[in-house]
Amino acid sequence: MNHFRKMEVINLTTLPMIPVDEHLAVSLVARNTMVKTVRKELENNPPSCLIGSMHQVNQKIADINLRTEPSANSLAIERFELEKKALREKTRSSPEDKVKRQRKSQYSCKGSELRHARSSVIKRKTADKNLLAELYQYSNFNSSKPNKLPNGVDFCDMVGNVVRAERDCLSGKHFCSGRELEKFLSSSSPRAIWLDSFWWIFHERYQPNKELQNNLFDRIAQHYALLLFRVPKSHSEEALLKRLPSLLSKAVYTSFCCCFPQSWFDTHEFKSDICNTMSLWISGTYPSPQSYDSWDYSELDPERFRREELMLYRRRLTKGREFSLFAGKRAFSQKPAQSRKFYHPQSSSANSPSEKTSSAKQNSEKSLRMQNTAKEHHCQTLVLKKPTQEVKRISEARECENMFPKKSCAACKSPELTSNLFNIYGKSPLIVYFLQNYASLQQHGKNVLIVRREKTTSTPDCTPTYTDVISETLCSMKKRKDNLNQLYQHHWTEWNYFDKHLKELQDNFSREMKNIDPKAADTKKANHMFIPPSAVNEESPDKKTKEGKGGEGKRRETEVEHFFPLTSKP
């Protein structure tokens, strides 16, 4: 038996069973915690694996219990939940303590930044048809308290998403304390505003119901007024109230993304609708256009972010392979050119031996300096301390930030600012509604209006950016360069053909000249073989005058007579 135990230990170490998580909507911290829990369960109940000789295998099979028993191993997450629930029931002392603890923990989300969703995983297996926002069936309106988030999504998990999204990626700090932000969002009034705003936007977009939406808006106004009228307020609460529209926009967005992971919410229309609604309800003004571009979507929409990150990583791998091949070819083509460049100064300095020795000394000194600096740098790196966790996190955040392309501005004229009247005292629709319906005092005083120029319209998404213009310009330049190279090659082929044709003509001409030259030499040689007659030159002057008067015909006859030999004389 000890031998089999050793074999089980060997199986665990050599063939570990790694659990695979298919629910990408859960945060990374939650997934890591779930993996640790399942691994602990596997260590406590190791799987049986038959490894060894045939004798050991047969002995192991003989020792197997063949009786039918129900499966002893359950899901690790379900078992952990059952044990945790039983432990809570044992520790509770009385019903009064139970009620007190329920009241105290009703709106508490301690440790939500590191919290992971366990129960939602089990419920989502049977609620796949409701993962689309368009097909979800809304339950009845609860007038006593806000309805919970759909599909078993825990509210504290959403609080953790917003808290992590408010953290600066490089410094890792919030605009206020993380605990203060967590405590504020999990308190009763912001929680009610959050949930009712979620359901109001859900009904506004997918299932319009004016009566139900009016009830939701009424409760939102009451909780917002209660939040403002509560005194005293700390400095952090004042800062949180100023950023409340942005916080609620992120909260509603991450709730939609996590509750309905099969729907697509990464659109300009949906995000601008959420931001405009929250800002108009609370402050009465529109937010800056496209303020959602600076959100941390790795925390607000983790499933889509991981998918895009994986696709981008694959594109980078393919581009890196192409670039490595291109760089290798380029380096191979540059090697002979570099050798030729290095050869010229040697040939030019061959005539002066003094210059050659001085250059050799300089090269040796430079090499010694380079070696010394390299040694010093190596010693410094050994002496330096290891980077801390914060430095590693900042470097990872910068790498992640550099992985995604930076946003480029639109290559067009910015939209004109519009003039709107703004009330200095503020006119929040929620407060106005609360005062009109629940306040006993009438509004007094006057409105002080000023002209406020704001940017209400944004450039359309189809507008090309400077990056697009630069890429199109580079593509056109590359295309023109290719066309020029093709024209250059065509030009050289035509010139080569023309040179070849001229060479053929010249060869034919030289061949014909070689055939003509012997014939001319033979005729010239034949002409020199004949002796010219002397009697022709001693003719009388009367005959010459007659010949001159006789015309060109007789002259030609006399010229012909010079070429005939004089055979006989009378």
Curated annotation (Swiss-Prot):
It comes from the Eukaryota. PANTHER family: PROTEIN FAM227A, PROTEIN FAM227B. Residues 87-99, 363-374, 540-562 have a biased composition (Basic and acidic residues). The modification Phosphoserine is found at residues 348-349. This is Protein FAM227A. The keyword Metal-binding does not apply. Keywords: Phosphoprotein. Residues 345-362 have a biased composition (Polar residues). Residues 87-112, 336-374, 519-570 are annotated as: Disordered. Coiled coil: none annotated. The modification Phosphotyrosine is found at residue 343. Belongs to the FAM227 family. InterPro entries: FAM227 (IPR029417).
